[in-house]
Swiss-Prot record:
Catalysed transformations (reactions): Endonucleolytic cleavage to 5'-phosphooligonucleotide end-products
Subunit annotation: Homodimer.
Pfam families associated with the record: Phage_endo_I
Gene Ontology MF, one: deoxyribonuclease IV (phage-T4-induced) activity
Name of the featured protein: Endonuclease I
EC number in record: 3.1.21.2
Organism of derivation: Escherichia phage T7
Length: 149
């Protein structure tokens, strides 16, 4: 598991969290090739430009983000990206979609996703996602990590 402390996030091997590591092992065990944090999706927070790096890009064009904690700024970012890049299929795998948005919140991560039309799962990527037909990814609108567009 990633550790959080004053100096930031500690990596777990090649991955930044235990859940990312677990999902990568799932894909590897099924012989599925994937790219890990290789693509940056540009998005705009009003008056400033940013990029978002999804965790996994599956061969069928589905981006998968893994989340243990899903804080407010991250939820806002995902809504902005969905608004600015409706052509991208970005889905989330949570450690637990039943986790509440904040202490005392009546809303869980899963309920938030349902409200906003975000596909999600718990623990691992569902087999149905992996078996879905290929979707075109507009790579010309994305930037490869460590490089230009």
């Amino acid at each position: 598991m990633a550790g959080y402390g004053a100096k930031g996030i500690r990596k777990v091997g090649a991955f930044r969290s235990g859940l990312e590591d677990k999902v990568s092992k799932q894909l590897e065990s099924k012989g599925i090739k994937f790219e890990y944090e290789e693509w940056k999706v540009p998005y705009v927070i009003p008056a400033s430009n940013h990029t978002y790096t999804p965790d996994f890009l599956l061969p069928n064009g589905i981006f998968v983000e893994t989340k243990g904690l899903w804080e407010s700024d991250d939820r806002k970012k995902h809504l902005l990206i969905r608004e600015q890049h409706p052509e991208l299929d970005i889905r989330i795998v949570f450690s637990s979609s039943r986790t509440k948005l904040y202490k005392g919140s009546p809303t869980s991560y899963g309920e938030f996703c349902e409200k906003h039309g975000i596909k999600f799962a718990d623990k691992l990527i569902p087999a149905e996602w992996i078996k879905e037909p290929k979707k075109e990814v507009p790579f010309d609108r994305l930037k490869r990590k460590g490089g230009k567009k």
